[in-house]
Every structure is written in C-alpha cells, then in structure tokens.
Amino acid sequence: MDSKELKNHVDGFWEEHIVPALFEYIKIPNKSPSFDKDWKENGYMDKVLQLAKKWVEKHLPDKSELLIKESPGKTPLLLVDIPGTKTGNILMYGHLDKQPEMEGWNEDLGPWKPVMKNEKLYGRGGADDGYALFASLCAVKGLHQQGLETPRILIFIEFCEESGSPDLPHYMELCSDIIGKPDLVVCLDSGAGDYKRFWTTTSLRGLVGCSLSVSVLNEGVHSGGASGHVPSSFRIARQLLSRLEDEETGEIKIKELHTNIPDYRKSETEKFVKTLGEEVVHEFPWKDKTQPTTNSLTEGVLRRTWRPALSVVGANGLPPSENAGNVLRPYTKLQLSIRIPPMVDPDLAQKAVVKALSNKTPYDATVVVECEEAAAGWSAPKTSEWLSTAINKASLEYFNEQDCSMSEGGTIPFMAMLGEKYPNAQFIITGVLGPNSNAHGPNEFLHIPYAKKLTCCIASIINDFN
C-alpha cells in the first residue's frame, strides 16, 4: 500500500465529499427516539436516511449492495455490503441518530447550525458519530483505488444508539445471515485521549436509565400553609437517591452495581495517565475553582470508567426559577443515568436500583420508577498479535506516535451484543471524541484533521487484516 497516495485520497475525499455531507446532516434535528417520541411523524429520521442513501449510492464500491431495513415500529437500519476479494469478514459500525440540543452553545454556534472554525466542524452529531458511515466508505475506497484486496466488509449503521439501541436485537436476528460471523469489528463511535495518536477503547460502561417520580399531593398548594406538615416531594426524592449514592463521596452503595477491576485494566489506566498527565483533569470545562472527586489521576480515571456513577440528567415538576411561586409542589420527577462497569449484569443492576428506590417509601408517598432497557458494559478480548502490530504501524505512519489504549465511561450497547454473540471476534473501538469535543453537550465539534488521519489508520489496518 502506498501510504502517501492513501493520505492524498482521504484528505481530498473528506474535503470534497464528506464535509459537505456532514454540513447537511448537522442541519437535521434527527433526535433519537428517547428524545423525540414523534420521530416517525416528524420525518427527520427519514430525511437523514435519504441523505445517507443518496450519498452511499453515489460512492458505492463496485459490486457492492446498499440495503435498508425498516421493520414496522422500528427505526431503520442501513447496511452497505462490500464483497471481499480475500478471506475474512469485517463489520464496521456507526449510528446516525443524535442526542438532544442541550443548552449553553456559544452565540455563533448551535446544535443544528454547522460551523467550520479552526478546522473543527461544530454541530450536533458530526463527531457522535455521523461521520462514521462516510469515513468507513472513504477508507475502503482508498484501498480499492490502489487495487488492493480487501475481505468482505459490512458497514452497519443504526438509528437508535442514543436511546440504548432497543431495535438492535430485532435487526441482529433479522439480518443474522447478512452479518455472518465477523472476524473483526470496527466501531468509530468512541473517544480519543488526545489528537496526537491513534486511540483504541478497551472497555465501555453499561447504563441503567430510569425516571424517579415522587408525588405527595393531587395539586400544588400554598407553601406557607402546608410546608412542614406536608412532606416535600423533593426531600423524599433526595432521601431515595441517598439509598443509591453516598452524597458525600458520590460512591454507589448497591453492591450489584460494582465489579472487581482486573489488574491489567488498572495497569492500562496507569499507562494512560502517564501518557496524558494532568490533561485527564484539564479536558473538562471546570467552573471557577471546582475540584475533581479525587486528587489521584489514576483513581479519577477509574471512577469514570470502571466504577458505577449516578447522574441526574433531567427533571419535571420544577418550574423555571423566574416563574417559581411560593407553592408546595405536588410532585418531583428526576431522570437518572446510572453508569455501570463492564462485567456487571445490567438486568440484575436495574432490579437492584428499582428495589432500592421503591421499598418502604417515606410517608407512603407515591413513588413510580420507570426504566429503559438496561445496557451492558463491555471489555475487549485480548488483542491478537497481527491486530496489535497493525494498529501501532498505522499510528506511527499517520501520527508519528505510538498508539495508546484506554477505558471509556460511555456506553455502546451494540459492542456488548457483538461481544456476547461473537466471542472470537477482534475489536477496534475508536473515534474522534477527544478533549473538548463535547459529545452530548454544547459546542460539540468534529476535529477534521484528526478524523482524516483516523480514516487513514482504519484503511491501513484493514489492509493488514489476516
């Protein structure tokens, strides 16, 4: 393979074909079904599907096939089946649904407003992970352009990842013959510790998502006449959350949500911290003098990757401060996001959470806990020698730096599904979500130079597949 020719192809293809497509993609508010209950009627998902379909048809490799599956009541699935000229089966994964808008975007930016600034493309979903479909095809075409042989490649793009991938088990069964048995899974939906090297993700946390609703009255009443006698729904919610979490330390109290961290993952984390140093703290946009939960860099990374953690990500029943009258509110509803470590059974974890929140409720208040489908975490199998060599070779070629691996605190449900179904498969979990790229938050950006180099690395690794 001519590395320089590949780089020229990738750079040109990104500028001419991928960046313009991502501009159009970012404009479409294709929120995942969890954040848009009327997604079908609103039509944004179909608009993105048609954009992707039209683009793929234009750039489809010879003898390849574009397949779209759309079962009743399910989000669509887009597949690009590229026949191989050498043995092997590679599955390349990404998604085209998005997180909601989130507040706090800079004045000149917005979730549905694509803006290119300092070689970074701002807007929701470009980095997480709308680029994956386009970059995957770019990598394959770069190899074909040089007449190089590739194994069979299936590009697999879902539309409900940000909702926990509830439709994937259905499509995994429906498309089992098409998927076959992957030898290598390439996922472009993960992170990067910096923009200086090729990063691989070796583990992901799982997720228990649920809402906690506490009701004490049928309607709000004057707080002057009721407070102190009628219990506060917010205080009860606080009490219930304290069953899950030590509010002094943030430690999760429920044993079913913990696991023993393998020594090799601890060693891997120490190497990660040695590579990045204080950047593992500085990557976050701290307010004023706010401090992390621990001064130990290694322990801090383990807390966000291999330990459970609770986040309250939304609330109902609380009026905006400027419109808050002196009313004892009838209810408080909190949306909870509980990250669980790899190797924790998500169903057992969810049952333990529901039990803790529901048993013996204070004052016999009405407490309702509603859960989404729990998602399992994932820990990578041992990397084969050929893949380890290919990854490091690619990083040295296109970044002039050794590759590095890390655990991630986010969740990609499909990886756990694939790991369970295909235990002999090898995995490359990587992505462009580096420092300050802020997926899910305001000012999300795609680092274009890094994305180009990552695309080259993926092509190089595919070329070295054996």
Indicate residue ranges for each PLM-predicted region:
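N-terminal helical capping/dimerization or prosegment-like subdomains
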Residues: D2-G104, Y331, L348
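Acidic, glycine-rich active-site loops and adjacent beta-strand->loop/helix elements
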Residues: L96-K98, K120, F156-S165, L188-G193, ...
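Active-site metal-coordination/substrate-binding segment of hydrolases
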Residues: T87-I157, K453
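Zn-dependent metallopeptidase/amidohydrolase metal-coordination segment
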Residues: S213-S215, G220-H222, A237, W306, ...
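Acidic-enriched catalytic cores of C-N bond-cleaving enzymes acting on peptides and small amides
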Residues: I178, G193, T202, G209, ...
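Acidic/histidine-rich catalytic neighborhood of metal-dependent amide-processing enzymes
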Residues: A127-S203
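Short beta-strand/turn micro-motifs at beta-sheet edges
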Residues: F198-T202, S321-N326
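A short beta-alpha structural unit
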Residues: I338-P342, V368-S384, E408
